[in-house]
Protein backbone atom coordinates (compact mmCIF):
# COMPACT_ATOMS: atom_id res chain seq x y z
CA UNK A 1 0.00 0.00 0.00
CA UNK A 2 1.40 3.39 -1.01
CA UNK A 3 2.03 5.72 1.90
CA UNK A 4 0.42 9.15 2.02
CA UNK A 5 2.58 12.25 1.41
CA UNK A 6 4.61 13.51 4.34
CA UNK A 7 2.82 16.33 6.15
CA UNK A 8 5.31 19.11 6.80
CA UNK A 9 4.45 22.41 8.45
CA UNK A 10 6.45 25.62 8.19
CA UNK A 11 6.13 28.69 10.41
CA UNK A 12 7.30 31.39 8.01
CA UNK A 13 8.49 34.44 9.93
CA UNK A 14 11.01 35.66 7.38
CA UNK A 15 10.83 39.22 6.03
CA UNK A 16 10.50 37.96 2.44
CA UNK A 17 7.66 35.53 3.05
CA UNK A 18 6.79 34.86 -0.59
CA UNK A 19 10.40 34.22 -1.59
CA UNK A 20 10.92 32.06 1.49
CA UNK A 21 7.86 29.98 0.65
CA UNK A 22 9.11 29.51 -2.92
CA UNK A 23 12.60 28.52 -1.75
CA UNK A 24 11.31 26.00 0.77
CA UNK A 25 8.84 24.54 -1.71
CA UNK A 26 11.78 24.01 -4.06
CA UNK A 27 14.16 22.38 -1.59
CA UNK A 28 11.55 20.22 0.16
CA UNK A 29 10.15 18.70 -3.03
CA UNK A 30 13.47 17.73 -4.62
CA UNK A 31 13.34 14.04 -3.67
CA UNK A 32 10.96 11.41 -5.03
CA UNK A 33 9.23 11.32 -1.63
CA UNK A 34 5.86 13.11 -1.92
CA UNK A 35 5.26 15.92 0.57
CA UNK A 36 2.26 18.00 1.58
CA UNK A 37 3.48 21.41 2.72
CA UNK A 38 1.53 23.68 5.10
CA UNK A 39 2.80 27.26 5.52
CA UNK A 40 1.73 29.32 8.53
CA UNK A 41 2.06 32.77 10.06
CA UNK A 42 1.78 33.57 13.82
CA UNK A 43 -1.68 35.05 14.41
CA UNK A 44 -0.58 37.26 17.30
CA UNK A 45 1.92 38.99 15.02
CA UNK A 46 -1.09 40.77 13.52
CA UNK A 47 -3.18 41.18 16.67
CA UNK A 48 -5.41 44.24 16.47
CA UNK A 49 -4.79 44.85 12.77
CA UNK A 50 -5.70 43.34 9.44
CA UNK A 51 -3.40 40.64 8.17
CA UNK A 52 -1.79 41.98 4.96
CA UNK A 53 -3.12 40.30 1.84
CA UNK A 54 0.47 39.56 0.81
CA UNK A 55 0.62 37.33 3.91
CA UNK A 56 -2.92 35.89 4.08
CA UNK A 57 -2.87 34.96 0.39
CA UNK A 58 0.12 32.63 0.78
CA UNK A 59 0.15 31.59 4.47
CA UNK A 60 -2.46 30.22 6.85
CA UNK A 61 -2.91 31.28 10.49
CA UNK A 62 -1.03 28.93 12.79
CA UNK A 63 -3.30 26.04 13.79
CA UNK A 64 -1.84 24.22 16.80
CA UNK A 65 -4.24 21.28 16.49
CA UNK A 66 -3.23 20.77 12.87
CA UNK A 67 0.44 21.12 13.80
CA UNK A 68 0.14 18.13 16.14
CA UNK A 69 -0.60 15.88 13.15
CA UNK A 70 2.49 16.87 11.15
CA UNK A 71 5.30 14.45 10.31
CA UNK A 72 7.80 17.29 10.36
CA UNK A 73 7.93 20.99 11.12
CA UNK A 74 10.25 23.89 10.30
CA UNK A 75 10.53 27.29 11.96
CA UNK A 76 12.32 29.74 9.69
CA UNK A 77 14.69 32.52 10.52
CA UNK A 78 13.54 36.09 11.12
CA UNK A 79 15.43 39.42 11.16
CA UNK A 80 14.72 39.90 14.88
CA UNK A 81 17.73 38.18 16.44
CA UNK A 82 18.91 41.41 18.10
CA UNK A 83 15.70 41.49 20.17
CA UNK A 84 15.45 39.65 23.45
CA UNK A 85 13.09 36.73 23.04
CA UNK A 86 10.56 38.30 25.41
CA UNK A 87 10.56 41.46 23.27
CA UNK A 88 9.09 39.52 20.33
CA UNK A 89 5.39 40.29 20.67
CA UNK A 90 4.28 36.90 19.32
CA UNK A 91 6.75 34.91 21.44
CA UNK A 92 3.98 33.28 23.53
CA UNK A 93 2.49 31.78 20.38
CA UNK A 94 5.91 30.53 19.28
CA UNK A 95 6.48 28.93 22.68
CA UNK A 96 3.08 27.24 22.52
CA UNK A 97 4.09 25.93 19.11
CA UNK A 98 7.41 24.66 20.46
CA UNK A 99 5.65 22.87 23.32
CA UNK A 100 3.26 21.22 20.86
CA UNK A 101 6.11 20.19 18.58
CA UNK A 102 8.01 18.61 21.47
CA UNK A 103 4.95 16.60 22.48
CA UNK A 104 3.62 15.50 19.10
CA UNK A 105 5.91 16.05 16.10
CA UNK A 106 8.82 13.61 15.64
CA UNK A 107 10.90 15.72 13.23
CA UNK A 108 11.72 19.36 13.90
CA UNK A 109 14.10 21.56 11.89
CA UNK A 110 14.90 25.01 13.22
CA UNK A 111 16.63 27.53 10.94
CA UNK A 112 18.66 30.55 12.10
CA UNK A 113 16.37 32.56 14.47
CA UNK A 114 14.13 29.51 14.63
CA UNK A 115 17.15 27.60 15.93
CA UNK A 116 17.91 30.33 18.45
CA UNK A 117 14.45 30.53 19.97
CA UNK A 118 14.10 26.73 20.06
CA UNK A 119 17.52 26.14 21.61
CA UNK A 120 16.69 28.73 24.26
CA UNK A 121 13.22 27.30 24.95
CA UNK A 122 14.22 23.63 25.14
CA UNK A 123 17.69 23.90 26.68
CA UNK A 124 17.95 27.37 28.21
CA UNK A 125 20.88 28.40 26.01
CA UNK A 126 21.48 32.16 25.95
CA UNK A 127 21.67 34.31 22.83
CA UNK A 128 24.60 36.69 22.45
CA UNK A 129 24.87 39.67 20.11
CA UNK A 130 27.87 39.49 17.77
CA UNK A 131 30.17 42.53 17.50
CA UNK A 132 29.64 42.46 13.72
CA UNK A 133 27.10 40.74 11.52
CA UNK A 134 28.22 37.32 10.30
CA UNK A 135 27.39 37.76 6.63
CA UNK A 136 28.72 35.72 3.76
CA UNK A 137 29.47 32.26 2.44
CA UNK A 138 31.89 30.33 4.63
CA UNK A 139 33.47 26.86 4.73
CA UNK A 140 32.28 24.57 7.53
CA UNK A 141 34.14 22.07 9.68
CA UNK A 142 32.39 18.81 10.60
CA UNK A 143 33.07 18.14 14.29
CA UNK A 144 30.69 15.22 14.82
CA UNK A 145 29.19 13.18 11.95
CA UNK A 146 25.42 13.19 11.62
CA UNK A 147 22.94 11.60 9.18
CA UNK A 148 21.88 15.03 7.90
CA UNK A 149 25.50 15.76 6.96
CA UNK A 150 25.94 12.49 5.09
CA UNK A 151 27.34 13.26 1.65
CA UNK A 152 29.15 16.44 2.74
CA UNK A 153 32.87 16.78 3.35
CA UNK A 154 34.88 19.17 5.48
CA UNK A 155 34.93 22.73 4.13
CA UNK A 156 31.45 22.44 2.61
CA UNK A 157 30.11 25.93 1.90
CA UNK A 158 27.07 27.54 3.46
CA UNK A 159 25.59 31.06 3.71
CA UNK A 160 25.40 32.80 7.09
CA UNK A 161 23.52 36.01 7.83
CA UNK A 162 23.00 36.91 11.47
CA UNK A 163 23.73 39.46 14.17
CA UNK A 164 23.61 36.97 17.05
CA UNK A 165 25.06 33.65 18.15
CA UNK A 166 24.00 31.13 20.75
CA UNK A 167 26.29 30.70 23.76
CA UNK A 168 28.75 28.03 22.63
CA UNK A 169 30.04 27.49 26.17
CA UNK A 170 26.50 26.82 27.34
CA UNK A 171 26.02 24.29 24.56
CA UNK A 172 29.28 22.52 25.43
CA UNK A 173 28.22 22.42 29.08
CA UNK A 174 24.95 20.62 28.27
CA UNK A 175 25.55 16.87 27.78
CA UNK A 176 22.31 16.61 25.81
CA UNK A 177 23.64 18.80 22.99
CA UNK A 178 26.20 18.15 20.25
CA UNK A 179 27.80 20.74 18.00
CA UNK A 180 28.04 18.84 14.73
CA UNK A 181 29.51 21.54 12.53
CA UNK A 182 30.77 25.11 12.70
CA UNK A 183 32.38 27.55 10.33
CA UNK A 184 36.14 27.08 10.19
CA UNK A 185 36.31 30.04 12.60
CA UNK A 186 34.00 28.42 15.13
CA UNK A 187 30.63 30.04 14.43
CA UNK A 188 27.71 27.62 14.80
CA UNK A 189 26.35 25.74 11.82
CA UNK A 190 24.47 22.75 13.27
CA UNK A 191 23.54 21.52 16.75
CA UNK A 192 21.60 18.33 17.53
CA UNK A 193 20.26 16.43 20.52
CA UNK A 194 20.46 12.65 21.13
CA UNK A 195 16.99 11.65 19.93
CA UNK A 196 17.48 13.32 16.52
CA UNK A 197 14.01 14.81 16.90
CA UNK A 198 15.32 18.37 16.90
CA UNK A 199 17.94 19.84 14.59
CA UNK A 200 19.16 23.42 14.93
CA UNK A 201 20.80 24.92 11.82
CA UNK A 202 22.12 28.48 12.06
CA UNK A 203 22.78 29.00 8.36
CA UNK A 204 20.26 30.11 5.75
CA UNK A 205 20.70 26.90 3.80
CA UNK A 206 17.35 27.54 2.10
CA UNK A 207 18.68 30.69 0.38
CA UNK A 208 18.95 30.58 -3.39
CA UNK A 209 21.70 32.32 -5.36
CA UNK A 210 20.27 35.79 -4.70
CA UNK A 211 19.29 35.37 -1.05
CA UNK A 212 22.25 37.17 0.52
CA UNK A 213 22.17 39.91 -2.11
CA UNK A 214 18.47 40.51 -1.48
CA UNK A 215 19.06 40.67 2.27
CA UNK A 216 21.77 43.30 1.81
CA UNK A 217 19.52 45.41 -0.45
CA UNK A 218 16.61 45.14 2.00
CA UNK A 219 18.74 46.44 4.87
CA UNK A 220 20.14 49.30 2.79
CA UNK A 221 16.64 50.30 1.66
CA UNK A 222 15.37 50.22 5.25
CA UNK A 223 18.31 52.17 6.69
CA UNK A 224 20.18 54.08 3.95
CA UNK A 225 22.02 56.04 6.63
CA UNK A 226 23.92 52.90 7.71
CA UNK A 227 27.00 51.77 5.80
CA UNK A 228 26.23 48.06 5.46
CA UNK A 229 28.94 45.62 4.40
CA UNK A 230 28.16 43.27 1.54
CA UNK A 231 28.28 39.52 2.01
CA UNK A 232 31.81 38.08 2.06
CA UNK A 233 33.10 35.34 -0.26
CA UNK A 234 29.86 35.62 -2.24
CA UNK A 235 30.53 37.60 -5.39
CA UNK A 236 32.76 36.29 -8.17
CA UNK A 237 34.72 39.53 -8.48
CA UNK A 238 35.24 42.56 -6.28
CA UNK A 239 32.93 45.41 -7.25
CA UNK A 240 30.95 43.10 -9.55
CA UNK A 241 27.73 42.54 -7.66
CA UNK A 242 25.69 41.15 -10.55
CA UNK A 243 27.16 37.64 -10.45
CA UNK A 244 26.92 36.10 -6.97
CA UNK A 245 28.06 32.54 -6.38
CA UNK A 246 25.75 29.67 -5.49
CA UNK A 247 28.42 27.35 -4.13
CA UNK A 248 26.26 26.03 -1.29
CA UNK A 249 23.80 24.32 -3.67
CA UNK A 250 25.16 20.87 -2.78
CA UNK A 251 24.95 21.72 0.93
CA UNK A 252 21.34 22.81 0.52
CA UNK A 253 20.30 19.79 -1.51
CA UNK A 254 22.14 17.29 0.69
CA UNK A 255 20.78 18.47 4.03
CA UNK A 256 17.18 18.96 2.94
CA UNK A 257 17.14 15.64 1.06
CA UNK A 258 18.59 13.88 4.11
CA UNK A 259 16.02 15.55 6.36
CA UNK A 260 13.10 14.55 4.14
CA UNK A 261 14.36 10.96 4.21
CA UNK A 262 14.65 11.19 8.02
CA UNK A 263 11.06 12.42 8.23
CA UNK A 264 9.93 9.56 5.99
CA UNK A 265 11.67 7.10 8.30
CA UNK A 266 10.05 8.60 11.43
CA UNK A 267 6.47 9.45 10.56
CA UNK A 268 3.92 10.80 13.00
CA UNK A 269 1.50 8.17 14.31
CA UNK A 270 -1.03 10.86 15.27
CA UNK A 271 -2.46 11.52 11.78
From Swiss-Prot:
It is an enzyme of class 2 (transferase). PANTHER family: HOMOSERINE O-SUCCINYLTRANSFERASE. Its EC number is 2.3.1.30. It comes from Lacticaseibacillus casei. Keywords: Acyltransferase, Amino-acid biosynthesis, Cysteine biosynthesis, Transferase. GO terms for cellular component: cytoplasm. It catalyses: L-serine + acetyl-CoA = O-acetyl-L-serine + CoA. Belongs to the MetA family. Is able to complement an E.coli cysE mutant strain but not an E.coli metA mutant. Pfam families: HTS. HAMAP family: MetA_acyltransf. One of its GO terms (biological process) is cysteine biosynthetic process from serine. The active site is at 112 (acyl-thioester intermediate), 204 (proton acceptor), 206. Gene3D superfamilies: 3.40.50.880. It comes from the Bacteria. This is Serine O-acetyltransferase.
